Design a protein with these regions (language model features):
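Export/targeting segments at the very N-terminus of extracytoplasmic proteins
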Residues: 2-4, 12-58
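Catalytic and binding regions of secreted/periplasmic enzymes and modules that target cell-wall glycans
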Residues: 24-25, 38, 43-50, 61, ...
């Protein structure tokens, strides 16, 4: 009996606990203060957060491998085609995976926004 209890206890540790999606899904609004800190205008924050939710659902290490330009990275899903621009801007040093750091990702998004507005994100995420 003790052996059976030991086996069951071990098995219970190996089975992941079930959680609701809401309990494990991050919230882009957690990055509001950081976005303001790196230079985003507070008037742009609602749209920024809406795009963040659409692009990554708040997962800082989101990576879209299917993107044809070596993927899209991080909160704002920055496209690999922007690597040269981001290197010239001093945001990315070597690898686009550096954009998994939320601060760096929001800086990159701001640099792209200042250059192109919301176009890199299709420009269709205005809050109603």
């Amino acid at each position: 009996m003790k052996r059976l209890l030991g086996v069951l206890a071990t098995a219970a540790l190996l089975v992941p606990a079930t959680q609701t999606q809401a309990a494990v899904e991050p919230d882009c609004r957690l990055y509001t203060a950081l976005a303001l800190e790196v230079g985003w205008d507070k008037r742009e924050i609602p749209r920024l957060m809406q795009i963040c939710k659409r692009e990554s659902k708040g997962f800082a290490r989101a990576w879209n491998q299917r993107d044809p330009y070596t993927g899209s990275y991080g909160l704002m899903q920055i496209n690999g085609s922007n690597k040269g621009f981001l290197q010239d801007a001093g945001i990315v040093r070597k690898a686009m995976t550096e954009l998994w750091a939320p601060r760096k990702n929001l800086k990159a998004a701001l640099a792209l926004f200042k250059r192109h507005g919301w176009l890199p994100w299709k420009g269709n995420s205005a809050p109603k």
